[in-house]
Amino acid sequence: MRSHYCGDVNKSHVGQEVTLVGWVNRSRDLGGVVFLDLRDREGLVQVVYDPDLPEVFNVASTLRAEFCVQVKGVVRARPDSQVNAQMKTGEIEVLGKELTIINSSEPLPLSLDNYQNNSEEQRLKYRYLDLRRPEMAQRLMFRAKVTSAVRRFLDSNGFLDIETPILTKATPEGARDYLVPSRTYKGQFFALPQSPQLFKQLLMMSGFDRYYQIVKCFRDEDLRADRQPEFTQIDIETSFMTSEQVMAKTEEMMRGLFLEMLNVDLGEFPRMTYNEAMRRFGSDKPDLRNPLELVDVADLLKEVEFAVFSGPANDEEGRVAALRIPGGASLSRKQIDDYTKFVGIYGAKGLAWMKLNDLTQGLEGIQSPVLKFLNEGIVNEIISRTGAQTGDIILFGADNATVVAESMGALRLKAGEDFNLLEGQWRPLWVVDFPMFEKINGSFHAVHHPFTAPRGVTPQELEANPANRVSDAYDMVLNGCELGGGSVRIHNQEMQSAVFRILGITDEEAKEKFGFLLEALRYGTPPHAGLAFGLDRIIMLMTGASSIRDVMAFPKTTTAACPLTNAPGFANPQQLAELGISVVKAAKTED
């Protein structure tokens, strides 16, 4: 039905007859000549119909936006005065000779031109219309090119694309599982995989030493701008490769991807330990475009008569951190109060501050509600450590270390945006040396997942002192987003059992949930390591989209619903009976 895509017609086709199909983007009658912009996935082209062909002209006069049509005509160059440099096809136009209306269109329930006026609900309900917008089409085409480039790289490096099961067994990986009831085994359930983690490890045990898969994963968790109930991973696993080799290979892939797709050379990725990232930036995925850093000052404040500072300063689990904002002395009291409310979201009880109005006047040139508790030596040392100057403000977070990191790390990002401090477009890094475990409510939890190997300890040493052990794990971070995370895996049954015990998983529970893995670890398991990238997040960053929903064809809402299909929906009674399921309706509450 077509000879060319609309967006591909150019000056080399002048004088040629072309057949185009697509949608009417805009139609206008100017002085007896009908101009229409015809659109397909590759772009727009202007088609002109004049009254010399009255039958065709009359049909062209009836066209409205989003009519699906076929056009036959001859390509001609536009006069210099009519060249449109804003259009890919702006040097030419097509003189229409034939016109077929394939399908008409009713008035659209949403605007494709002023899409900002469309609600998120509208855009998702009529997603097939929203995807006609060039911006959306270009993102999905970009995504297709990225996955093609990833496959090409991995294929050429000896990786095998192997599928793993979608219907599997529930395993504790951090989020809630989506469960699928079994008809043949009443009362039993499959789980949709949160990742192919265990299956790809089993593939390593099977001898397939380089595996990859671009795979759907499912997590029933609270949603944010960068979360969806179903998402896509670039999943990679290797045998007989160290963490350094895995990092080198995947960094090579990512650098090549950015060079090919965006003509951007990311350069060599720097390394940063988890502890350094948390200390300097309050985050294990720091945005290095932001020059602001947290500075520890607790050692200066142990003896001050201000419990807000001295309490955390003398607490082993406490922290007092200072954040210098260049030019921040211009902040009004209301703006400081807004920052105080902001850190409160992350558990902070308040925000102390110090405005450096004129350092040539000593303490007289400093404005701060906490200045009366600090002597000149302490103030000067804080100014020296933070590198603050006249016109700056220093903000203080004082609490347990976790609250300080989360609240001041978030404030660092906000202040960097508010004061336009971001430097450079792309700042990648590797974060390494993560702790093996974190303690939550008195119990140990895996920082990555239960199959991550510790670095340089025996199972006995790990169980004797789990709190201070480092894992052989690594995260790739770009502009404050975690692109992917991975680790060396445990390939020894004794070590795996030790980790389960530390996590409070009894031997009986481990056998019930992970018996197949523990069994497999008995039969010559090779050392193996891997990494998984979040494809949706990578595309979001590369295209500048504000949400991963804008780089997925048919995403869910923030409440995990699909307005297009009205999913999820109720099952009919017959289906439920076959599955042995009865639905318990919530009891009505009286006012």
Curated annotation (Swiss-Prot):
GO annotation, biological process: aspartyl-tRNA aminoacylation
GO molecular function: aspartate-tRNA ligase activity; ATP binding; nucleic acid binding
Subcellular location: Cytoplasm
EC number(s) given by UniProt: 6.1.1.12
Stretch list, region Aspartate: 197-200
InterPro entries linked: Aa-tRNA-synt_II (IPR004364), aa-tRNA-synth_II (IPR006195), aa-tRNA-synth_II/BPL/LPL (IPR045864), Asp-tRNA-ligase_1 (IPR004524), Asp-tRNA-ligase_1_N (IPR047089), Asp/Asn-tRNA-synth_IIb (IPR002312), AspRS_core (IPR047090), GAD-like_sf (IPR004115)
Residues binding L-aspartate, per UniProt: 173, 219, 448, 489
Catalytic activity: tRNA(Asp) + L-aspartate + ATP = L-aspartyl-tRNA(Asp) + AMP + diphosphate
Residues annotated for ATP binding in this entry: 219-221, 228, 482, 534-537
Classification via CDD domains: AspRS_core, EcAspRS_like_N
Keywords for this protein: Aminoacyl-tRNA synthetase, ATP-binding, Cytoplasm, Ligase, Nucleotide-binding, Protein biosynthesis
Protein name per UniProt: Aspartate--tRNA ligase
